[in-house]
């Protein structure tokens, strides 16, 4: 178990202030934005000056991109327009560009639109063009790259950042990248540095994920509750994310009513929060309430139409008997393809036994970018779906290397072991998956039951 697990228990004895925003992938973005804006005392003076660019930077493409007008009537769109105006009036000062960059990050998080992370990265490029090549630009760039799943580039930038400055969010983004790449021990060490510097929602939520990732569910729940206790009522999305993660941990523990309460809390704090709706749909499916699950999952998939969301919706619709609508959703998954979530699409194809060569290709491409347990699992599953079970075996070993207690990892490992005639491990892993089968989608639970029956029949014939 990583050293972070031992050291966290000591830090829990400290007293904590009211904490701010956090998510695992982009956990600290809004607190940075709030701090930047709070420290900025510039007032807008209507008509005081011409807001058109009169600066050599106006010819630099990244600067033009980030100042381009965009449509939208939501409050976040007004924030972006205001920050763009301030950037123009400050002659593209680095602080103004930094605030604009974090506002784009906020927009990306609220809308699940990754194109705004691209704009945040362009803000960092524009900052550097002004000569501001210091840690503030590096943090913004590392954050954007990590959110865009450009992990190798992000790691390079994050390591450069922590070599020049050692603030909590610097270690946070480095840890995020390393965890995504499968470098769990290094990521845990970065998170420990973050905790030592600032024990708050952001650092404890990250530590909770590491606990879960390394098989300590109870520790993950304890730390996520600690993170939530330090959240601010003014920071709704952060607390909503933490409550959503807690709900999934509670569901895995079998505490379904507590899990529902956690999703209620998340949605009270942040209405239309797709991850909480997805989690709530999963819980309702586990409680055998598919019509209610469909309502949640329809909304979630509309807000964030990634393969995992639409897969859950299709399964829920099938359970209600609406197979025609389920087929429509499945067709949409294929039409959208794997551009936004190659790994998720690969898993879907392999589970359905469709276009397995594409599933392999997508998973292999992902593995060149990040080598975490979930990507190894995706490749193992795709190879097995294509009948290449011997090649799948080493990736199963990697997928289970952190002792992650995840129903999907265990399901895939058990089926692949059975296909490789390893009945002992097949029985063990399928049994472990069955203990937390509430974490699987209905089509996966069907596979689990079918393979457990096959193993049972095979063993009975040997007796």
Predicted feature residues:
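TPR-repeat structural position
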Residues: 76, 110, 117, 151, ...
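Residue signature of alpha-solenoid helical repeat architecture, marking inter-repeat boundaries
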Residues: 91, 95-98, 132, 165, ...
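Canonical tetratricopeptide repeat
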Residues: 99, 140, 173-174, 206, ...
């Amino acid at each position: 178990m990583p050293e972070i697990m031992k050291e966290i228990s000591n830090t829990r004895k400290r007293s904590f202030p009211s904490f701010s925003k956090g998510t695992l992938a982009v956990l600290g973005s809004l607190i940075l934005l709030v701090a930047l804006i709070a420290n900025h005392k510039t007032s807008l003076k209507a008509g005081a000056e011409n807001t058109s660019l009169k600066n050599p930077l106006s010819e630099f493409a990244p600067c033009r991109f980030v100042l381009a007008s965009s449509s939208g009537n939501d409050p976040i769109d007004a924030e972006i327009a205001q920050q763009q105006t301030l950037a123009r009036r400050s002659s593209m000062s680095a602080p103004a560009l930094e605030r604009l960059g974090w506002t784009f990050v906020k927009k990306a998080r609220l809308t699940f639109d990754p194109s705004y992370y691209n704009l945040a990265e362009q803000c960092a490029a524009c900052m550097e063009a002004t000569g501001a090549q210091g840690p503030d630009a590096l943090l913004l760039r590392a954050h954007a790259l990590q959110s865009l799943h450009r992990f190798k580039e992000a790691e390079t930038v994050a390591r450069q950042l922590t070599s020049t400055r050692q603030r909590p969010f610097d270690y946070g983004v480095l840890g995020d990248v390393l965890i995504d790449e499968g470098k769990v021990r290094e990521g845990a060490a970065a998170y420990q540095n973050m905790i030592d510097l600032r024990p708050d929602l952001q650092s404890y939520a990250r530590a909770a994920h590491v606990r879960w990732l390394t098989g300590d569910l109870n520790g993950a729940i304890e730390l996520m509750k600690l993170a939530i206790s330090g959240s601010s009522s003014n920071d709704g999305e952060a607390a909503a994310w933490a409550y959503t993660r807690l709900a999934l941990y509670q569901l895995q523990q079998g505490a379904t009513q507590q899990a529902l309460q956690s999703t209620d809390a998340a949605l009270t704090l942040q209405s239309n929060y797709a991850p909480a709706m997805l989690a709530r749909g999963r819980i309702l499916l586990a409680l055998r309430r598919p019509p209610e699950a469909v309502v949640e999952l329809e909304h979630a998939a509309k807000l964030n139409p990634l393969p995992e969301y639409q897969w859950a919706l299709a399964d829920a619709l099938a359970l209600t008997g609406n197979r025609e609508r389920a087929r429509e959703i499945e067709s949409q998954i294929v039409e959208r393809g794997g551009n936004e979530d190659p790994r998720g699409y690969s898993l879907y194809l392999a589970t359905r036994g469709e276009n397995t060569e594409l599933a392999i290709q997508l998973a292999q491409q992902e593995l060149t970018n990040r080598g975490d347990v979930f990507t190894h699992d995706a490749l193992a599953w795709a190879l097995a779906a294509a009948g290449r079970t011997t090649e799948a075996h080493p990736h199963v070993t990697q997928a289970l290397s952190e002792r992650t207690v995840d129903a999907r990892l265990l399901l895939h490992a058990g089926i692949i072991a059975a296909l490789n005639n390893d009945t002992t491990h097949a029985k063990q892993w399928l049994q472990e998956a069955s203990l937390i089968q509430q974490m699987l989608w209905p089509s996966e639970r069907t596979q689990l039951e079918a393979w457990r029956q096959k193993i049972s029949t095979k063993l009975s014939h040997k007796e």
